[in-house]
Amino acid sequence: LKWEAHTEFVTYTIFLNNLSEKPFDGICFDAFPKDWLESLSSLRITSVNLRLETMSDQENSSEIISKKLANWFVPESLAVSKVLDGSAVVASDFRIDEVGHQRFVLFVDPLTDERRVGRIIQRLCEIEMYKSMSMLGFARVRSMARQMGNIDTELSHIMSDMNDGKVAAEVTLDNLLKVSTELETLSAAASFRLGATEAYEAIVHQRIRVLREERFKGRQTFSEFMMRRYDPAMRTVKSSRVRLGNLADRAIRAGDLLRTRVDVERSAQNQALLTSMDKRADLQLRLQKTVEGLSVVAISYYAVSLVSYLLYPLAENYSVTEGFLTSIITLPVVGLVYLMIRRIRSKML
């Protein structure tokens, strides 16, 4: 029994020396205690039933292998390859059989080194293991597709409202915040899974490359199977990741445009306020000048009266009438009052 711990999962590999009479009957999995299997709280991602056969010169012929493969696998999805310079033949249809396992078979030449056989087995298990883990990302993006579509539509509506200018900036900002929050939540939830999927995909293709596949009897190779069945799913994951990033960029641009719109509106409001303040200041200045003029008249009136009262007794000695005296002192008094008020105002400023 071999146990391996990975970042997200663990693997259990059991090796049995004797081949069962009925290929892929799943009896080897009975070696795992049922109560132990039932006690596992984790989800089983994949299960591989790999059969290893060492062929004699006669049995290792292409016809015998082809006959066995036809009996063990579904022909429509069967992938077969000679690997590592023809030292072995690997095959699988990548389908789950009736007992819940994926079937792999490895035919090896009797002269093939045990270490090389072990490496081939390790690569085959890793191909299926990392393929299954990467498909978790495909399941995630399928569940995200509708939500991303809704966010895309909402962003389009927000941009349309901003273009029309009929919706208040506060309403647009509230809608944009809701969409941005939903988008950020979605991105945070999917970021790790999409990144892990990309890493797992790279491992799958790397493991297939190191097998150095050669075509067997015109059948599709593992790399060709992956290109037809696996790569489209991974391209969907990549395109969804790019789409998610584009949605985030659109939300950022929408926020920038809204900020620009608010700044322009605020600038226009400030300009209007400054214009209003200028008009008000001009009005206050004119009113101040009017009040100043009235103040000069009022003060001058009382000043002339006081000066007349003071000078009239003296003016009688010279036979000067009160009216003539008033007319003489009015202009000088008014001038003095005006100069006095101007001086007071200049000191206040």
What is the predicted function of each stretch?
Residues L1-N18:
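Ser/Thr/Asn(+Pro)-rich, low-complexity disordered segments
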Residues I96-T112, V141-M148, D152, L186-L211, ...:
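Short, positively charged
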Residues T46, L84, T112-D113, H157, ...:
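Cytosol-facing regions at membranes
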